[in-house]
Amino acid sequence: MTEFKSAPAYQEAKYLTSAAEFDQLPPDQGAEIAFIGRSNAGKSSALNIITGIKGLARTSKTPGRTQMINFFALNEHERLVDLPGYGYAKVPRMVQKRWEELVDSYLKNRRCLKGLVVVMDIRHPLKEMDEDVIEWAVNYDIPIHILLTKSDKLSQNAAKKTLGEVQTAISAYGEKLTLQLFSSHDRTGLDEVKAVLSQWFRSEP
């Protein structure tokens, strides 16, 4: 049984592979932490800031561009995973349904998944699909950490107010969910999210 005691070197992240179907996923071994969120919530930007590698995860002004599960290797055993964005109205329903089925299969069956980071724009938190994803993850007993991104777009007081409102809304889940403020622009919350990821990676298999 392999144990991961030290924090991974996020700056060592390298693109590994992409999967459009469940059977295209890399071997289910080691440890993975996945990122998911609405299109344009800042998911790719968060991955780029966390790793310190500009352009690692492709960002786009066009929501819905990430249509596959993208894997980034930190080392031989540990990976960050960029799940398809959801909630973009211009994506055909058939395509959207395929994404949902792929993500659901990943969350349900991926044994090496250590935790799920749910990325939400702080100005539009807890949309219906966000709540659906949280329900999926809770049902599959996956730890969840919520990033309220783009916190620099609000005043400090407004950001703290929204943080409190979301905390109240998810309080029924207890310790299964944690959350924080985050900004890729001014790096608010960067050390905090890295600490959460490192704790998950160090957890027992």
Swiss-Prot record:
UniProt keyword Signal, yes or no: no
Gene Ontology MF: a single term: GTP binding
Residue ranges annotated for the EngB-type G domain, each copy included: 29-203
Binding site for Mg(2+): S44, T66
InterPro entries assigned to the protein according to its UniProt record, in alphabetical order: G_ENGB_dom, GTP-bd, GTP-bd_ribosome_bio_YsxC, P-loop_NTPase
Binding site for GTP: 37-44, 64-68, 82-85, 149-152, 182-184
Cofactors, names only: Mg(2+)
Gene Ontology cellular-component terms listed: cytosol
One GO BP: division septum assembly
Keyword line: Cell cycle, Cell division, GTP-binding, Magnesium, Metal-binding, Nucleotide-binding, Septation
PROSITE patterns in the record: G_ENGB
Family: Belongs to the TRAFAC class TrmE-Era-EngA-EngB-Septin-like GTPase superfamily. EngB GTPase family.
UniProt function note: Necessary for normal cell division and for the maintenance of normal septation.
NCBIfam families: GTPase_YsxC (TIGR03598)
HAMAP family tied to this protein: GTPase_EngB
Record-given protein name: Probable GTP-binding protein EngB
Gene: engB
